[in-house]
Amino acid sequence: LTVGTDQPVYPPWYLDDDPTSGRGFESAVAYAIADQLGFAREAVTWVRVPFNAAIAPGPKTYDLNLTEFSISDERRQAVDFSSPYYDVAQAVITVEGNAFAGATTVAELKGARLGGQVGTTSYQAIVDQIAPTAEPAVYNTNDDAKLALQNGQVDALVVDLPTAFFITSAELDGGVIVGQLPTGSGVPEQFGAVLDKDSPLTGCVSEAVDALRADGTLGALEQEWLASAGAAPELR
């Protein structure tokens, strides 16, 4: 079984940029899915695929890919998704002392210089939910985005909530979470495994994810790897 992910990958999804370790939420989920499908850990091979390339149309180098891919109708035109393995919220992060650190509403962020990673729903959330006056900055990786924030090139970044907790607690001097964006129009944002369009494995992988949700495995892995994320105030 070949599993794809981005290069690099970040905690709490993968630890030490090593997807093979089984440490980090998505690494652990990938091995749990493999186990459900009858693959021993040794039978799992990992490949690295850039985020945007992984959801582009055309043949894939992987059977399934776990890189915090949010399920969307637009993406479904090019790839298949499994059942969702995680329900996600988007959050705004900045550094202490920034003029926008104390914002409590989405409207207060309209004047901010905001940034996000290319092709992500985090970036889309800036455009759709915040709609800032200035064009949002776009970065190839979260590392580039963090650097821009540290250097004062942007006021704030939008990332998924577990990533926000990790960046502000472990990677960004004086990093603070401004708050999480409201979940919006009733459709929850969820991460799913990406598969080739019309892959014969899609149904099996979805059944595996559903079984892991039903038997409590997903909940336990969330507690283990993402619980420290906790909650953040919701921006009104």
Regions found by a protein language model. Name each.
Residues 1-66, 77:
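Extracytoplasmic small-molecule ligand-binding "clamshell" domains
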Residues 2-6, 23, 105-120:
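Short loop->beta-strand "edge-of-pocket" segments that line small-molecule binding or catalytic clefts
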Residues 16-19, 30-42, 122-140, 169-172:
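Ligand-binding cleft/hinge of the Venus flytrap
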Residues 44-56, 101-102, 137-151:
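Short helix-initiation/N-cap motifs at beta->coil->alpha
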Residues 53, 69-78, 127-128, 150-151, ...:
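A ligand-binding cleft/hinge motif common to bilobed small-molecule-binding domains
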Residues 83, 95-113:
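Flexible hinge/capping segments at coil-to-helix
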Residues 87-94, 161-162, 169-210, 228-236:
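Periplasmic-binding protein-like
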Residues 121-136, 176-178, 207-236:
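Ligand-binding clefts/hinges and TM-proximal coupling segments of bilobed small-molecule sensing domains
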